[in-house]
From Swiss-Prot:
Family: Belongs to the SXP/RAL-2 family.
Domain of life: Eukaryota
Residues that span the membrane, as ranges: none
InterPro entries membership: ANIS5_cation-bd (IPR003677), SXP/RAL-2_related (IPR052823)
Tissues in which the UniProt entry reports expression: High levels in the hypodermal layer of the adult female.
Key words of the record: Signal
Gene behind the chain: OV17
Keyword Signal: yes
Origin species: Onchocerca volvulus
A Pfam family reported for this protein in Swiss-Prot or TrEMBL: ANIS5_cation-bd
Signal sequence interval, chain numbering: 1-16
Disordered: annotated span: 24-43
Name of this protein: OV-17 antigen
Length: 164
């Protein structure tokens, strides 16, 4: 009799393991969603829309900036309504932020050592290339940063880090 009870308990535990794993996976996925920063133009969007947006960005790592921008615009146009209005506002803010960054960047470059200026010029050419994918840009810029001496790397990072 004890054997039957132990066997039954064992079978129940074994049957519950896959269900428990599935619950843990669902909790992990929800945590990842909660930890992601939601772009302002998708505030209030259903989780499925936010997931779709992040999946789009992930697959677009192998596309050029122009291709990614076209994919994002098509995604936003498909959503329409207030998402489109908020996206337009967001892009205006991005344009201003880019102008501010470029001003700060130029001021920093003016103070760079010759080695930092050279590295910055190479990285800027990569970042501005319309022919490279996001992944290629990231890898090539990282390779340049990794090849720099510690002092030059710190010089660039400190100069371009937001000042508080």
């Amino acid at each position: 009799m004890k054997f039957v009870i132990l066997l039954t308990i064992g079978l129940l535990v074994v049957a519950a393991i896959p269900q428990r794993r599935q619950q843990q996976q669902q909790q992990q996925q929800q945590q990842q969603r909660d930890e992601r920063e939601i772009p302002p133009f998708l505030e209030g969007a259903p989780p499925s829309v936010i997931d779709e947006f992040y999946n789009l960005l992930k697959t677009d790592e192998n596309k050029t900036d122009q291709q990614t921008e076209a994919d994002v615009e098509a995604f936003i146009n498909r959503l329409g309504g207030s998402y489109k209005v908020r996206f337009t506002q967001f892009m205006e803010e991005v344009k201003k932020a880019r102008a501010d960054y470029e001003r700060i960047h130029q001021q920093a470059v003016a103070r760079f050592s010759p080695a930092a200026k050279d590295a910055d010029a190479r990285m800027s050419a990569i970042a501005d290339s319309p022919h490279l994918t996001t992944r290629q840009k990231s890898q090539q810029i990282q390779a340049i940063m990794d090849s720099l001496s510690e002092s030059v790397r710190r010089e660039i990072i400190n100069a371009l880090s937001p000042q508080e």
